[in-house]
């Protein structure tokens, strides 16, 4: 059985969608993720971590230092939406696809009243940015009680929301099948087998999670 996360699938999709000028860098980034290599935290990654942490603190009633008017307004808006929800909800489940058994795993930023919320801090936003993301198909598959998935997005100036409901997208099995076929066709399947096989640490992560 093999471990599979939306982060790995998203890294692969990012490579597939990259413009020619960025294809080499996107492939390098994906292979680094595939091979579980340590990565330095980039400025963009840290901005996302800090933004989510500020929302978590605000939801928990912990005061935060003001940053800027638009930033603080985004924090307040998203905190109101997430308030009363359950934070950091782990989800897991097994799937058999392309002749392989997978253990899917993820963590929802917030779950509230049947809605999964995921917080995104981006540099640039275009409508439909997450249309083909594997995150909402995977998480809605894993959390059967949720009816929809909403991305809460802040680009430094404005806030946005993208919502997806069941039936709006292809099942996660289709993405996994394409992913495995691509790995096979391009000679990377052994990297996946080597670095993503189930182990004790991963079993401990899913211990106690009600699987789909």
List the model feature ranges, each with a label.
Residues 178-212:
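Non-catalytic C-terminal interaction segments of nucleic acid-processing enzymes
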Residues 11, 18, 26, 47, ...:
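A general marker of short, structured functional hotspots
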């Amino acid at each position: 059985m093999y471990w599979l996360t939306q982060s790995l699938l998203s890294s692969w999709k990012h490579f597939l969608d990259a413009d020619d000028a960025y294809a080499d860098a996107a492939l390098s980034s994906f292979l680094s993720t595939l091979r579980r290599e340590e990565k330095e935290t980039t400025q963009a990654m840290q901005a996302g971590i800090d933004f989510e942490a500020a929302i978590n603190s605000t939801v928990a009633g912990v005061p935060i230092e003001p940053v800027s008017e638009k930033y603080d307004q985004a924090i307040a808006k998203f905190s109101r939406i997430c308030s009363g929800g359950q934070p950091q909800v782990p989800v897991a489940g097994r799937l058999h696809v392309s002749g392989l058994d997978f253990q899917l795993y993820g963590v929802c930023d917030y779950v509230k009243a049947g809605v999964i919320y995921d917080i995104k801090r981006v540099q640039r936003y275009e409508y439909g940015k997450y249309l083909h993301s594997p995150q909402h198909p995977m998480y809605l598959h894993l959390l059967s009680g949720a009816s929809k998935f909403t991305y809460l997005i802040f680009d430094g100036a404005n806030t946005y929301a993208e919502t997806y409901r069941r039936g709006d997208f292809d099942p996660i099995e289709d993405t996994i099948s394409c992913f495995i076929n691509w790995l096979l066709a391009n000679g990377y399947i052994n990297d996946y087998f080597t670095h993503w096989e189930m182990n004790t640490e991963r079993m401990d992560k899913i211990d106690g999670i009600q699987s789909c």
